[in-house]
C-alpha cells in the first residue's frame, strides 16, 4: 500500500497575521503536512480535515472588540492538541472562559520571557538560566492586549514583567498558548517549540519529505492524466522547470513544453533552457522565437503597467498559436504553488488584501477545453526548490535569483528597444558573473542591472563618449516583503563597473542603488 504522506496533518487557522504562512512553512520543515485555512472554516470542514493538532495563528484584531474573529467551536470539540499563538492564545483564553484586556505597556520586538510552569511544550527548552535557576527564552513579541485571567485548569507557562501570563498550558488536554511568535527566526528556540508541539504532543511523524513528495506527486499525476497528453508553458523559472522535470519523470513523452523566447531573457537563457530540458533530459520542447513580435508590440510604450500587459497578452498569443498546432492535448500543466492557492481562496472570501493576477495561460483552458494539472499546488517556494534538487535539477538553476515575468521589459526604464535589451543583458551577465566569483551571489537574495534611457558623458582614451547609464541593484531579504540593499565590497563594485564600461560599447556610467524596501520596491518598474 502506498504511503499516505498527508495522513499526519496539522490545521492552521489564519486570523490575519503577517506571519501565518511562516507558521505553515515551519511545520512543513519539520516534515509534517499542514494546511492554512481562514479562521471561519466551518465545523464540518474541520472535522473532515481530521487534523492531529490545530494551531490558532496571530492577527491584528482585539478579542474584546465587537465582531472580532473567533475560533470555530469544532476546534475545541475535536479533542486534539491546540496551540494558540499571540491573538490565537487570546481568543483561546477568552472562548474557554478566561479574560483578555488591553495593556498599558505594549510589547513589540525582542523580549525575554521567564519559563514559569513545567509543561510538555517547553520542558528542557531554554536560552539561558539566571542565578536563581529561572529558565529564560529570547523571543519576538508583537501584541497590545494580554490575557489577565486564564481559563479553568490552565497554568502559567511563561511571563514577562509587563505580561505576567505570556504563556499558558493545560497538559491534560494538550492545550497551549504563547504570547510570543515561535515561527519567526528572532525566537531562537522557536523551531524546537513547534517541533515539540507537532511531533511529540500531536504525535505526527515526519512523512512530508522531498523524496516522499516526489513519489506522491508522480503517483497523483499518473492517476489524473492516465494516457492523455499534457501541455506546459516552460519559462525557465524555478516553478515551471520543476513542473517540467516532475511531469517528464511521471509521464515521459506525453508531455510537450512550449518555450516562448520573447527577446527579453537573460544572456544565453533560451539556449540554456533548451540544453537542459531538450538535450540533457529528453523533454519534448518547442521553442517559439518571438522576439520581433514582442518588440514590435512594445514599440513606443513607456508606461510600466501597460508594458506588462502588452508582454502578457503577447505571450498568450504566441503560446496559443503554438498550442493550436498540437493534436490530442487534454491537459494544461501550471506551476501554481501553495501561496497562489491561499491568495485565490482569500480573494474569493473577500479576506485578501493583495490579489495576484496570473496571466501566463490566459483563457487557454476554456478555449481548448483543457483540464488543469497542478502538481506543485500544495508546496511553498522553498519546498519547490527542494523538490527540484530531488528531481536532479542543477543547484544553480533551482536557487537562481527571481526574475520578473515580463523579463528585461521592466528592467529597461521607459520604451523597450532591442539595442537596450542587448546592452542590458550583457551588463547583467557581467554583474552576476562577478558576484559568483566573489562568493556573493547566494549571499544576496536578488541582484540585477537596470537600464536607464539617459546619456552621460565619459572619457575613453583621449576621447569623450556620450553613452547610456545603468544601475546595479542587489538586496538581501527573507520574504521579499521588506529588503535592505546589499553592502557589497567596494572592490567588487569597482570590478563590476570597470568591466561593464570597458567591455560594453554604449555604457559610460554605472551607479549602485542604495535604496531599501520600503520605501523603494526591489524592481524599478
Curated annotation (Swiss-Prot):
SUPFAM superfamilies: Adenine nucleotide alpha hydrolases-like, Class I glutamine amidotransferase-like, GMP synthetase C-terminal dimerisation domain. Catalyzes the synthesis of GMP from XMP. GO terms for cellular component: cytosol. The lineage of its organism: Bacteria, Pseudomonadati, Pseudomonadota, Gammaproteobacteria, Pseudomonadales. The active site is at residues 86, 181, 183. It comes from Pseudomonas putida (strain W619). The gene is guaA. Gene3D superfamilies: 3.30.300.10, 3.40.50.880, HUPs. It holds the Pfam family GMP_synt_C. Residues 9-207 form the Glutamine amidotransferase type-1 domain. Keywords: ATP-binding, Glutamine amidotransferase, GMP biosynthesis, Ligase, Nucleotide-binding, Purine biosynthesis. Its EC number is 6.3.5.2. Residues 208-400 form the GMPS ATP-PPase domain. GO terms for molecular function: ATP binding; GMP synthase activity. Pathway: Purine metabolism; GMP biosynthesis; GMP from XMP (L-Gln route): step 1/1. CDD domains: GATase1_GMP_Synthase (cd01742), GMP_synthase_C (cd01997). It catalyses: XMP + L-glutamine + ATP + H2O = GMP + L-glutamate + AMP + diphosphate + 2 H(+). This is GMP synthase [glutamine-hydrolyzing].
Amino acid at each position: 500500500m502506498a504511503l499516505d504522506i498527508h495522513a499526519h496533518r496539522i490545521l492552521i487557522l489564519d486570523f490575519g497575521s503577517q506571519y501565518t504562512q511562516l507558521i505553515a512553512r515551519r511545520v512543513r520543515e519539520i516534515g509534517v503536512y499542514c494546511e492554512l485555512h481562514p479562521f471561519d472554516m466551518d465545523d464540518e470542514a474541520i472535522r473532515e480535515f481530521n487534523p492531529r493538532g490545530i494551531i490558532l495563528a496571530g492577527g491584528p484584531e482585539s478579542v474584546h472588540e465587537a465582531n472580532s474573529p473567533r475560533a470555530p467551536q469544532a476546534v475545541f470539540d475535536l479533542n486534539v492538541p491546540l496551540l494558540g499563538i499571540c491573538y490565537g492564545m487570546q481568543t483561546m483564553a477568552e472562548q474557554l472562559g478566561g479574560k483578555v484586556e488591553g495593556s498599558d505597556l505594549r510589547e513589540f520586538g525582542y523580549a525575554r520571557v521567564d519559563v514559569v510552569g513545567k509543561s510538555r511544550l517547553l520542558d528542557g527548552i531554554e536560552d539561558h538560566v539566571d542565578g536563581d535557576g529561572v529558565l529564560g527564552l529570547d523571543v519576538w513579541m508583537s501584541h497590545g492586549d494580554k490575557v489577565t485571567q486564564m481559563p479553568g485548569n490552565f497554568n502559567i507557562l511563561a511571563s514577562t514583567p509587563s505580561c505576567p501570563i505570556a504563556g499558558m498550558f493545560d497538559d491534560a488536554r494538550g492545550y497551549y498558548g504563547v504570547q510570543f511568535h515561535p515561527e519567526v527566526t528572532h525566537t531562537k528556540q522557536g523551531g524546537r517549540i513547534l517541533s515539540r508541539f507537532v511531533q511529540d504532543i500531536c504525535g505526527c511523524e515526519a512523512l512530508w519529505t522531498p523524496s516522499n513528495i516526489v513519489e506522491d506527486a508522480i503517483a497523483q499525476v499518473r492517476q489524473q492524466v492516465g494516457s492523455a497528453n499534457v501541455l506546459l508553458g516552460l519559462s525557465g523559472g524555478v516553478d515551471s522547470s520543476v513542473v517540467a522535470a516532475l511531469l517528464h519523470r511521471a509521464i515521459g513523452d506525453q508531455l510537450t513544453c512550449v518555450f516562448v523566447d520573447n527577446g527579453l531573457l537573460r544572456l544565453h537563457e533560451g539556449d540554456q533552457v533548451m540544453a537542459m530540458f531538450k538535450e540533457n533530459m529528453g523533454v519534448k520542447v518547442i521553442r517559439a522565437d518571438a522576439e520581433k513580435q514582442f518588440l514590435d508590440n512594445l514599440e513606443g510604450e513607456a508606461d510600466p503597467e501597460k508594458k506588462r500587459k502588452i508582454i502578457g497578452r503577447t505571450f498568450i498569443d504566441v503560446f496559443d498559436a503554438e498550442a493550436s498546432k498540437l493534436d490530442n492535448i487534454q491537459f494544461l500543466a501550471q506551476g501554481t504553488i501553495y501561496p497562489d492557492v491561499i491568495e485565490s481562496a482569500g480573494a474569493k472570501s473577500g479576506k485578501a488584501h493583495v490579489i495576484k493576477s496570473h496571466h501566463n495561460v490566459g483563457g487557454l483552458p476554456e478555449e481548448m477545453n483543457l483540464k488543469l494539472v497542478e502538481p506543485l499546488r500544495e508546496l511553498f517556494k522553498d519546498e519547490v526548490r527542494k523538490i527540484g534538487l530531488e528531481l536532479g535539477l542543477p543547484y544553480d538553476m533551482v536557487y537562481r535569483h527571481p526574475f520578473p515575468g515580463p523579463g528585461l521589459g521592466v528592467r529597461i526604464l521607459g520604451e523597450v528597444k532591442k539595442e537596450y535589451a542587448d546592452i542590458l543583458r550583457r551588463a547583467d551577465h557581467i554583474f552576476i558573473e562577478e558576484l559568483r566569483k566573489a562568493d556573493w551571489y547566494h549571499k544576496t537574495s536578488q541582484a540585477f542591472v537596470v537600464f536607464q534611457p539617459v546619456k552621460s558623458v565619459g572619457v575613453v582614451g583621449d576621447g569623450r563618449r556620450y553613452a547610456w547609464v545603468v544601475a546595479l541593484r542587489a538586496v538581501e531579504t527573507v520574504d521579499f516583503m521588506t529588503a535592505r540593499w546589499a553592502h557589497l565590497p567596494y572592490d567588487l563594485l569597482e570590478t563590476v563597473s570597470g568591466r561593464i564600461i570597458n567591455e560594453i560599447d554604449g555604457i559610460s556610467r554605472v551607479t549602485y542603488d542604495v535604496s531599501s524596501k520600503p520605501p523603494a520596491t526591489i524592481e524599478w518598474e
